[in-house]
Amino acid sequence: AYGKSKGATINVNTMDFTRLDLDWLLEIIGRLVEAGADIVRIDDICAPCIPAVYEHHAKAVKAKIGDVPLAIHSHDDFDLATAAQLSALQGGAEILEGCINGLGERAGVPNIAVLAAICEIFYGYDTGIRLDGFQELSEFVAQVWNQPIPEHLPGNGRTAFSHAAEVHYVLPSDDQWSFNAWAPSVLGNTDKVALCHYSGPMAIKRRASDMSLGELDTATANLVLEQVRKELKLRNGPLTDQLFTELVEVAARASASGETDTERLEAWNRLLQSD
């Protein structure tokens, strides 16, 4: 009543809603709305249930509060926070919540960039958010919080749109959908070539092209691939752009000059010793 008297928008938060008796939860929420609540927010506290519960409870709460907006707050303890948000949305929730890079207590909360993208791509909503600005914002928050963006963070991670297996590169260059559900540019991210033991010459060619190292012929690409596989075993980790560039340069010289296997091996060894 005090907040309403001051003209404030009253957002009430019902915490741990999934472990409350549903009838009792609805009784509490009904009284809060009668007292003037402008927004009802249901908060799972620690995600102790499956997504279907969020939809079920959201439907029940929405039937109780009518036109009063329903918000949902979920946590990622079981890696289900985003699914919980979408289930609540399908149950009638109008306000979804997340955070940049999924930052939050314990395992975090939904990554708001992906949550917003899902709402637009799959549900057709206009969120009013400039989605392609999320990557810049993600990197800014990571810097300010001194918490690097997780490599595999959907949408914003460095490898979120990376492809390694050779089968991903044997398709026509303009085929971007056979192995992608959405374009990295939606969130301002980019796709990357991640080399691994499943990579082949087409992946080598694509990475060289992306790095402006020229268009490699198949023979040169195979020379690079041979050494890339050796390096991956030795280093037990990804190759840096610098090392890849040096491998391409050595292979290109070998192909152009017709170096023997022994000469090429000596060149590789000199490169590794200088690395």
Predicted stretch roles:
Residues 18, 74-75, 194:
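A generic secondary-structure micro-motif detector
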Residues 1-70, 86-93:
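Alpha/beta enzyme core
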Residues 14, 104, 230-233:
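Generic anion/oxyanion-binding catalytic loop in active/binding sites
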